[in-house]
Swiss-Prot record:
Residues 1-31, 43-189, 205-224, 278-316 are annotated as: Disordered. Residues 138-147, 169-180 have a biased composition (Low complexity). One of its GO terms (biological process) is type B pancreatic cell differentiation. Residues 1-20 are annotated as: SNAG domain. The keyword Transcription regulation applies. This is Insulinoma-associated protein 1. The gene is insm1. Belongs to the INSM1 family. It is found in: Nucleus. SMART domains: ZnF_C2H2. It comes from Xenopus tropicalis.
Amino acid sequence: MPKGFLVKRSRKSPPVSYRVREEEEPRGESLPGWMLLATMCPTGGAPPPCSPDRATQAPCCSSPRPPPAGQFGNPDTVQQALYSPTRPVSREQRERKYLGSPVSAESFPGLGTSSEALLYPPTGTANGHHGLALLPPVSSSSSVSRSQGKRPAPEPDSKPAAMPGTGPGATSSSAPSKPPAAKKTKAIRKLTFEDEVTTSPVLGLKIKEGPVEPPRPRAASSGPRPLGEFICQLCKEEYSDPFSLAQHKCSRIVRVEYRCPECHKVFSCPANLASHRRWHKPRPPVASTAQAKEEPLSDRDTPSPGASESGSEDGLYECPRCARKFRRQAYLRKHLLSHQAAKEPEEPGVMMFPGEEQRAKSPPSLNAQECHPCPVCGETFPGKSSQERHIRLLHSSQLYPCKYCPATFYSSPGLTRHINKCHPSENRQVILLQVPVRPAC
């Protein structure tokens, strides 16, 4: 690139035009002094613009006449002096200057003929007649912009203007300008949702295994493409939203069942099955606790035999004589006493208490705390058998026998309590029979 090719432009560029001095131009050639005076003091009248005929006759008018002296010194005709030292240029010098410049010759080849009247209007009558023109004091950038705005349309046979740097006079160092690169569009990342063939830890669900294949290309005639890539990896079906894809996947999930081997109940979680099977294990018998609860009942005034109504089919305690089952061991003991009382009646007129013979054979207890008082007269006896014999012999009229079993009680409330507990399904009017009937008024 030659020295001075790039010109630093400021906001106010100096009115100096770029020109290349040719070698054949004489160094000592200078303009006459009257041209400088005409430039500093132009006349107010503006002649008509130069015609193309005058442009062709411009080389013949090489010796201009001096302007009349009357134009100088007239205050009315003198305009404001120009502050920029612009020198007038003849047509030959203008053509040599702009055609010699590589920028003007290459960029604006038709500038000398098409815009000569615009760039170089005549400033006076004398100068216009002699074919002289004055260059206005403008910068190179403003002159180029004005010439481009006011330049007439080229004729059809005219050649298009060459781009800078492509003409024959262009320097090899000037690189051709490249068109602006198109803005790269941001690559849209496609969202792919691939299924992981795993086993779900929730409720024993297991996903069917299937070969994972790359997604198939979508057909152009299948309608608009869904917003997201929601594709099932098992059957390669596309869905427009994740909810539809989730509903489709639920149909492909296999439910694992956990069945109880004893009752064949189905569970979906192995932990639920384990907690269920604990109920099938047999519980330890509670006979010891039931016996401890029934001990106070056996120490009643009169032992009552087992009731027939207490037997049930689902009982755990079975009688060895009649094959009846009882839910509690105390009920079975009372029932066995009834069998013994039916076998050993000693006195036909006196009712025997069940188990009296066995109790009589047992050695009497000499402990003072084991004395049994009579509920009628208050006499104490060392054993239960002697107490019962005393009551049977002396207080037989005050006994309350049970109507439904051979048990005998010493008071009406005791008999009522026995019937309500051991004979709930029988007729309870037996309580009313024990009450003496009042005489009618």
